[in-house]
Structure formats: C-alpha cells, structure tokens
Amino acid sequence: MSNKSVLLIAGEPSGDLLGAHLAQSLKSLEPNLKLAGMGGKRMREAGVEVFINADKLAVVGLLEILRQFRDIRHAMQTLKRYFKKTPPDLVVFIDYPGFNLHMAKQAKKAGIKVLYYVSPQIWAWRYGRIKKIKKYVDHMAVLFDFEEKLYQKENVPVSFVGHPLANAPTPSLSRNEICKQFNLDPDKPIVALFPGSREQEINKLLPMMVQAGKLIQTQIPTVQFILPLALNLALDKIRPFLSPEIKVIQNDISHVLAIAHAAVAASGTVTLEIALQQVPLVIIYKVAPLTFWLGKKLIRLSFIGLCNLVSPEPVAVELLQQDATPQAIADEVFQLLNNHNYRQSIIGKLGHLRPQLDRGNAAQNVAKVIHNLIFS
C-alpha cells in the first residue's frame, strides 16, 4: 500500500482541467496515492483535496496582477507552510509560470522533487527563465516537440507528452442530435463565442462580441450564436453583456465545436482546441495599454494565438487592442462563413495541426513520468 503524496498546483481553468485529468490517471496507476493542491472545481471533482481555490488567481497583465496581489500572496504563503509542515513526495506545477516558478524555488528549498507540466513560453519571451528551471525543476513535461528539443539542448530532463487536446474524445452524438439538444437549426450557420474564462477578459471582450454579432446578423439574418460558459464563471457575471440571440450553455466545448461553422475566441488555449476541431476562427484580445506596451517590448513573436504559434503558417486572423473592433470581427466572421475558397483554405491548414501534437493520452504519459520520479 502506497503512502506517497503528490501536490498538484494549477492557477487557471485550463490548468485545473489538466490537473483533473492527471489526477484521474495517477489514481488509475496508484489508487492509494494521496493528491492535494491548488486548483478549481474540476480537480476537486477528480478527487484532489483542493485547499487553495484558484478561481481568483487567473489574471493576466501587470495591472491585473497588482489588483489580485493579496490573493496571490496568500496562496504563496499557504503553500510555503504546506511545504514545511506536510512535504509531499513530489510537486507538480501546471503552467501558470509567474506564480509556479517562484513556488518551485520554495519547493526545492524544502527538499521536495519538482515536475513542471506545460512549459513556460521561454521560446517566446524571457528565455533567461531557463536558469530557474534548471535550478528548481527535476523534470519538464512539455506539450510540443520543439520544446523537448529546446530543453534537451539545455540539458534539462524532459518528456514530450503530447498535447491533451490532440487526443481529446469526440462527441458520440450526431450534428443533428447536438443541434436538437441546444435548440439550434442545423441548416443555419452557427457561430461559437469564447470570450475567455477570466473576469477581465469577459468585461473587455464579450461586449465587443455581442456588438459584432448584431453586425453579422444584418448581413446573415439566419446566423445563430452559442456561448459555452467556462466552469469557473457564473451566468450572472456575463448576463449584463448578453443579447437575447446568444444561447449560453454550461461548459460543453466539444459539442459546441462539433456543430460550429466559425468561432470568435479570446487568445488562449481554447484557440488551439477550436483549431484542432477544424473550425475556422478569429482571435481577439485586449489588455490594459501599459500591459500591451510592455508585452510588445518583451515578446519576440509575431502572433499571440496558440494555434498560430504551433502552426507552420498562420491559421487565424488576430485582432488585438485597437484593431479588435465589432466591425473588424464581423467582417472576418462573414468571410469565414461566406467566402468558400477562403474558408476551405483555412480548414485545410487546420487539418495539419493534430498529427504534430498527438502522442496518445497526455495525462497518462505525465502520470507515468511522475510514477517513475516518486517510485524509482
């Protein structure tokens, strides 16, 4: 019987989902393994003893972090105490690099093994963080093959586990069945809206999406809109921004993407999820002007959308800051729906993404790495 324990640390909804899948895989490998950590509803449902709720910690940008500083500091102090009083056999840090790299240092100081799941984007900006990773991380579990090569070059122990989204199950229901379930007409165009999972994203992006929707309706009166609500968001949070024609459902992205003809999405992991289902999309994002200015100074990339970053060529138009207007969004969605050649060209490019990222079940692959680290 195992008395080993693993701490899972996730600070965002995407990390919470990865943590939940990882917890399930770990339990199937080692049923008596104790799992605790920081996360959200998904991890809790997967049997993790979540003692820090991460819902308030999912922020992006300097000003936004300052506003949530008290919650972030409290989470850090709680984890430091946990490391000292109840040290686990291993800590798994999932994404969320600003917080997690700092806490990896604290875990290492306490003599705890560290695995980092989902690499910080050091290939995009602040490559110098590789020094911290070398010093404080025992093993990296990365989602992209080019990241594996990067860490191998730097002599950091690493495993390319594949991207979880590339191996996600597809809905068993037919398109007509899903449309019936959502009370949508399968013969009319459907546009999916993904305004993000953070309050700051909702406040900035959802009003634009709603206005863009009204403009699209003037060109395509039969268009239908569907918005899968992120698990960490209450309907009351978005209700003030909604218009009657937008159908809101609770976090059912796979079924939504199975019926959508196009999507409008906040930059983030969801852009890759949409792209892997070969749904043409437009990416939008807005942050505080100072945050954007700092980002432009520091980031070495031409694109911010994850689907564009991992593709040999751009697969989605990005509308950022002042370029993200209702009219610009509506114009691009109209092209994605009505310009047949353009639409087919985009779908063709999207079809090349999955083979690059699929290495089987990513959560099971990470669980095996963890098992080797704590039982070898």
From Swiss-Prot:
It is an enzyme of class 2 (transferase). The keyword Cytoplasm does not apply. It comes from the Bacteria. GO terms for cellular component: membrane. It catalyses: a lipid X + a UDP-2-N,3-O-bis[(3R)-3-hydroxyacyl]-alpha-D-glucosamine = a lipid A disaccharide + UDP + H(+). Keywords: Glycosyltransferase, Lipid A biosynthesis, Lipid biosynthesis, Lipid metabolism, Transferase. SUPFAM superfamilies: UDP-Glycosyltransferase/glycogen phosphorylase. GO terms for molecular function: lipid-A-disaccharide synthase activity; phospholipid binding. The keyword Lipid metabolism applies. GO terms for biological process: lipid A biosynthetic process. Its EC number is 2.4.1.182. Pathway: Bacterial outer membrane biogenesis; LPS lipid A biosynthesis. Condensation of UDP-2,3-diacylglucosamine and 2,3-diacylglucosamine-1-phosphate to form lipid A disaccharide, a precursor of lipid A, a phosphorylated glycolipid that anchors the lipopolysaccharide to the outer membrane of the cell. Belongs to the LpxB family. This is Lipid-A-disaccharide synthase. The gene is lpxB.
